[in-house]
Amino acid sequence: MLLPNTNWFWYTHENELRLDLGDTLTFVAPFALKNLVNLPSDKQLFSLEDTEHYVALAESLDNSGLELSDGELVQILLNATAALKFHKPIGMKSWLYKTQSTSGVHYQLALLEPTDTAYPELGQVIVIEQDGACATCMLISNEFAVNSSKKFSKFEMIKVMNDRLIPCLVDIPVYKRA
């Protein structure tokens, strides 16, 4: 897995938020600039706080048992870190999802169930921030249709009430257990 280092820095170029990872590697965040705030006007170092978010989420996902390639994991980690640092607050969309009798998260992973029964697919999300009764999530499913007029894309941000979150329990292989 790619680990943060002191040479990484955020910047904007050609209407994109980017992270220079050194060695000619550049990460481009999937978020439109209109949805971001506090953008760097020049190079902005990947901070200690960014590193803490990145590493904490990496540990959580590793413990969850979710099977991801190194590339998928790094992409999720970088997108989540960028969202926490730069994404504008988003509006609640709880009415799109069913209230759950047993709700919560498991190692920051959760599922969302659309209220529209014509769309039975669950969307898998990572909870990147929780405050009070709400959760800000990032979709990690490839896409997620919740009704005939609304479809979310991978890495799109979704904010819901905590009672909409279904804990995503993944089988943990024996070799991952302590």
Curated annotation (Swiss-Prot):
Record keyword Cell cycle present: yes
Classification via InterPro entries: ZapC, ZapC_C, ZapC_N
Record-annotated disulphide pairs: none
One GO location term (cellular component): cytoplasm
Subcellular location: Cytoplasm
Chief localisation class: cytoplasm
GO-annotated biological processes: division septum assembly; FtsZ-dependent cytokinesis
Keywords assigned: Cell cycle, Cell division, Cytoplasm, Septation
Lipid metabolism in keyword set: no
Subunit structure: Interacts directly with FtsZ.
Primary role: Contributes to the efficiency of the cell division process by stabilizing the polymeric form of the cell division protein FtsZ. Acts by promoting interactions between FtsZ protofilaments and suppressing the GTPase activity of FtsZ.
UniProt family annotation: Belongs to the ZapC family.
Protein name per the record: Cell division protein ZapC
Gene name linked to the record: zapC
